[in-house]
Structures are given as structure tokens and as C-alpha cells.
Amino acid sequence: GGTSLGDFKDCDIVIEAMKPGTLDRLGLSYEDLKKVNPKIVFCCVSGYGMTGPYENMPSHGVAYDTWAGCVEPARDEEGMVYLPAHPSIGMHAGPLLGAFAALAAVMRARETGEGAFLEIGQSDGAAYMDWYRIESYKAYQRPQSEVTGNAADDFRRRPVGTAGLKEGVRYQAYECKDGYVLFMASEQAFWKNFCEGVGRMDMF
């Protein structure tokens, strides 16, 4: 048989993992459901959210990552463009963030008696997971008068996070006799400990 509003009176969470408004057209919108269950949490996980020019665009996989700037086409030796090997970020990050939000909303509903409507865009999830590069890009857009380095680096202007650290020495991977080691002493306290440990306080 069909699904009725009464089927949702004891539900904690309803997840709409389709184009926004699909359940609404079936008479099962958040507004409909909360009439029979005020504590219900309605989580809509879509590609590009519920507003904007891409609201109803069907897509999946790497499409969210290209929208967020996480992946770009590559060229082969003949100059032909192709999509490089890339782990899909948005289609995993979006639902994961939705699960966190839904569980938090359930805890709130049990305390307050009020449900919640949650909107999750998988493209937004991809952009969130790529915050290192985004923040680094924005850092270089700041006025030169704004210092982005620190005293130990002579206040040298540089991007944040791990982006742009190819020439860095305090946050770097090094090849060793038996493999590789990841050296992470970007913070002042850790760099000081390292300098003391190797007897080179002149580098601090």
C-alpha cells in the first residue's frame, strides 16, 4: 500500500535524498509531517541545495566537486582533455554532514519538543572539504598591509594550511633511509622544541 502521514508519527528522522520538493509533491513535506509529529527532523540532501539556478539540476558523482573547484580537467601528451583520477568528495561529504546535523537536531528535539528542517547540498559539502585551498586563495587576496606570516618566518607572506608549501621546511614530508617522515612543526612551540632538540636555537 501507499505511505500515509500516520506512518511518520513515531519517526525521528526523514531523509529526502532526491531532487528538492519530491516528497512535497507526494504530500509528505516537512510542513505536512510536523502536523502529525512536531518533533520530526526532515533532512533534504540534494545536489545543489533548494535555491539557486542549479536547484533542479540532476547530477551525481564528480559533478559536485567540479562545481566546488576541487577537480579540474587534465591534458594528456597529445593535448586531449580528460578527467583525472579523483575521489568523489561531495557525494560522500554531503550525506556525512547531513547525518551529523540530523543527529544533533534529534537531540535538540528530544529536549525542546521541536523538530527541524535541514538542507544539505552535496556541492556545498565538497566546497567545505576543500577549505584549505579556498582559504589559501583568499589569503593572497588580502591587502599587502595585512601580515599572514609570523615572526619566526620574518613575517613572510604565504598561504595558510598545507597549500603552497612546496618550498616549506617546517611543514613538509622528507625522504628517509627506510621510507618517509612527515615533519609538522609549523606552530611556534613545536618549532622551538625541535630547534632545542637538535641544538640549533639559532634557527628559532
Give the role of each language-model region.
Residues G1-E114:
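N-terminal helix-loop segment corresponding to the beta1-alpha1 unit
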Residues P143-Y171:
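Active-site Gly/Thr loop motif
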